[in-house]
Amino acid sequence: MGIKALAGRDLLAIADLTIEEMKSLLQLAADLKSGVLKPHCRKILGLLFYKASTRTRVSFTAAMYQLGGQVLDLNPSVTQVGRGEPIQDTARVLDRYIDILAVRTFKQTDLQTFADHAKMPIINALSDLEHPCQILADLQTIKECFGKLEGLTVTYLGDGNNVAHSLILGGVMMGMTVRVATPKNYEPLAEIVQQAQQIAAPGGKVELTDDPKAAAQGSHILYTDVWASMGQEDLADSRIPIFQPYQINQELLALADPEAIVLHCLPAHRGEEITDAVMEGPQSRLWDQAENRMHAQKALMVALLGLV
């Protein structure tokens, strides 16, 4: 069925997609970016973000405007959901007004509650468990650089957080080796690793280590994120000495494949998880990666709204 099977569905986690559906989404994103396809709609996207956002908010907004639709910013601080209205009530009401809803929240279970009580598609715009929209853009960027995904090795260095979770799942579904290098006690959730082993395409696998240099050796992509996620700001300073060996710098990058690229989902703490020299260097693809958030999310909305 491919892309058409996504019409009316939700995307709460990256593994909500089949391997075929993910490949179709990535191709659709490429076609939208190149202008091969120019769908048009008069749909309304709602953004309900309980956490701060730059790239996700702006890229979703720009994507819907480019499609000819409208966007409502449903800030919890000025809507009743921020004053305690139950999620199920908010979901039922919004379902009568808008066509698709992107939610950035803390609990994955909140996303499921929205999905259970609304007929419109619900998109996970980041939760504490996963960040599927980010990984769609990451995979699009990697494919643009290498012309393929299968057989590549991507190394994630740092905290085993929501981005790491979605990268593990999305990467193995595309037949990639996903190496994750974290300090001890900061590994990705065991259930995510187990799930990845169950859904991996041929050639896809997860490798966990606490050795950043071994993880970087020969890798095609080095990827990092902040060492303390949103809501963990009080832990940031104490984590710096723990995570310092996992910084992507010129020394670590030299261990990777000579044609390796560097990714970061942003925002970055320059000089902590990644150096200025690497961010601004010739192997950095951070700005292409950020741009592709718009194209990947446009493809996702086009598919979920049944516009193709």
Curated annotation (Swiss-Prot):
Reaction catalysed by this enzyme: carbamoyl phosphate + L-ornithine = L-citrulline + phosphate + H(+)
GO biological process, one term: arginine biosynthetic process via ornithine
Annotated positions binding L-ornithine: N162, D225, S229, M230
CC per GO annotation: cytoplasm
Pfam families according to UniProt: OTCace (PF00185), OTCace_N (PF02729)
Compartment list: Cytoplasm
Record-linked InterPro entries: Asp/Orn_carbamoyltranf_P-bd (IPR006132), Asp/Orn_carbamoylTrfase (IPR006130), Asp/Orn_carbamoylTrfase_sf (IPR036901), Asp_carbamoyltransf_Asp/Orn-bd (IPR006131), Orn/put_carbamltrans (IPR002292), OTCase_ArgI (IPR024904)
EC numbers: 2.1.3.3
Binding site for carbamoyl phosphate: S53, T54, R55, T56, Q80, R104, H131, P132, C133, Q134, C265, L266, R293
Keyword match Transferase: yes
Superkingdom of source: Bacteria
Primary location class: cytoplasm
Keyword tags: Amino-acid biosynthesis, Arginine biosynthesis, Cytoplasm, Transferase
Pathway per the UniProt entry: Amino-acid biosynthesis; L-arginine biosynthesis; L-arginine from L-ornithine and carbamoyl phosphate: step 1/3
EC top class named in words: transferase
Gene Ontology MF, one: amino acid binding
Family of this protein: Belongs to the aspartate/ornithine carbamoyltransferase superfamily. OTCase family.
Role description: Reversibly catalyzes the transfer of the carbamoyl group from carbamoyl phosphate (CP) to the N(epsilon) atom of ornithine (ORN) to produce L-citrulline.
Protein name: Ornithine carbamoyltransferase
Protein species of origin: Synechocystis sp. (strain ATCC 27184 / PCC 6803 / Kazusa)
Name of encoding gene: argF
